[in-house]
Amino acid sequence: MALDIHAHRILILDFGSQYTQLIARRVREIGVYCELHPFDMDDEAIREFNPRGIILAGGPESVHEANSPRAPQAVFDLNVPVLGICYGMQTMAEQMGGKVEGSDLREFGYARVDVVGKSRLLDGIEDHVDDDGVLGLDVWMSHGDKVTQMPGNFNILASTPSCPIAGMYDDVRGYYGVQFHPEVTHTKQGGRILSRFVQDICGCEALWTASNIVEDAIAQVRAQVGSANVLLGLSGGVDSSVVAALLHRAIGDQLTCVFVDNGLLRLHEGDQVMAMFKENMGVKVIRADAEKQFLDNLEGEADPEKKRKIIGRTFIDVFDAEASKLENIQFLAQGTIYPDVIESAGAKSGKAHVIKSHHNVGGLPEEMNLKLVEPLRELFKDEVRKIGLELGLPYDMVYRHPFPGPGLGVRILGEVKKEYADILRRADHIFIEELRKADWYHKTSQAFVVFQPVKSVGVVGDGRRYAWVVALRAVETVDFMTARWAHLPYELLETVSGRIINEIDGISRVTYDVSSKPPATIEWE
């Protein structure tokens, strides 16, 4: 009998915290499957999900305000362990008969909590022990309200001078609340605390591993597809590359990939994609050389959003034309990942604060009457990378920096021309090559060159040169929501600048972008 890697599962209810997806990623890192659902998930759906434990996440609301979110009653009727984090602790306390009040003393950022009670959750977990034998934890706080009265049968778990009930517990029922955030790295023992809850208290085994996920995904694909043929748009990005490798292992020649070369890729990228998948792995890949079509459609357009739409529409036209030449295709594969699923669900329910618009292949599934195959839809990005390595993809491919869907089209400011793209490709290649040589590539989260359609005077030998300006951009970030410009060594910047100006005819000046996000975005367009 096949192993059910979803059997031991945790339910996470989202009350709107910026950290909620981080909780899910931390639980997955422990090796346990979990799903993220809105706080108002109906009772029947919760019972059907049949979790071994439930985590109530944080949120921006105040429990004592009218119409603030509450946990469904099923959470407390299932007789499974519950962990409330920040707002989750507050609503648990209030719903079970305790009291929550606002406070003039808000806690945001680093704090030290004293471990007061003897609970299963924190037993043996500490960062400090003071002279009186009191255990302490270094944690991350982000709250204004606080629990001032616990429900019956609860004991104090942790406290700070301004928040006497910074944690509470009922070991008999397995109910726990912490005012701090164990999911963020600033809470040093956060991983151990979550592992204690998920594995020891909820009894979940670590079944959610890369090798198990691959085996399960292959079985699911084979069961869904059978002997039918599958079409995949291969971009060379991480998600589509992992989908291609996974589907090829699952169904072999039933998979056909279409690689659209739009003329806006990095240097030699098209050849590298073909070499990796067609020549080395034996995947059926059709290469559509559509550079002229993309550049013709972009001619004269300088507006960034309009450029994106033109590139998106042209991709669909080219992909559609290639797909229509194929016979007996019943399925379309896409690299949808779990954050996309969460955002789509949020959009439908109206609860999501920020919605990204994704264009994969537009309305193609409906037009061609194709059914969707989405083998990565349960996975976060970091899990997709681990799966890629498990499938044998090279580390440098799996951990390459993000590249925008419109490619160099949004790294060329203003109108896109072939001359600009060719210059930018070479400059970008030099920058990345030198970052790798200096062991800085994986220290940065994203690095690239931007082409600026302005000319500057330079001197070459005894002559004057009037040529283009490019900007180097390198950032460090954890989540791409905020980012800091990378403090690259001056010697490295000097080497990159020297090579670009000397080796590329057409560039006279190199600048370095020292803007952080916010206020700037990572990409220039």
UniProtKB/Swiss-Prot annotation:
Residues 208-400 form the GMPS ATP-PPase domain. Its EC number is 6.3.5.2. Pathway: Purine metabolism; GMP biosynthesis; GMP from XMP (L-Gln route): step 1/1. It comes from the Bacteria. GO terms for molecular function: ATP binding; GMP synthase activity. The keyword Ion transport does not apply. GO terms for cellular component: cytosol. ATP binds at residues 235-241. The active site is at residues 86, 181, 183. PROSITE patterns: GATASE_TYPE_1, GMPS_ATP_PPASE. Transmembrane segments: none annotated. The keyword Hydrolase does not apply. It is an enzyme of class 6 (ligase). Keywords: ATP-binding, Glutamine amidotransferase, GMP biosynthesis, Ligase, Nucleotide-binding, Purine biosynthesis. Pfam families: GATase, GMP_synt_C, NAD_synthase. It catalyses: XMP + L-glutamine + ATP + H2O = GMP + L-glutamate + AMP + diphosphate + 2 H(+). Residues 9-207 form the Glutamine amidotransferase type-1 domain. PANTHER family: GMP SYNTHASE [GLUTAMINE-HYDROLYZING], GMP SYNTHASE-RELATED. Homodimer. NCBIfam families: guaA_Cterm, guaA_Nterm, PRK00074.1. Catalyzes the synthesis of GMP from XMP. This is GMP synthase [glutamine-hydrolyzing]. It comes from Pseudomonas putida (strain ATCC 47054 / DSM 6125 / CFBP 8728 / NCIMB 11950 / KT2440). The gene is guaA.
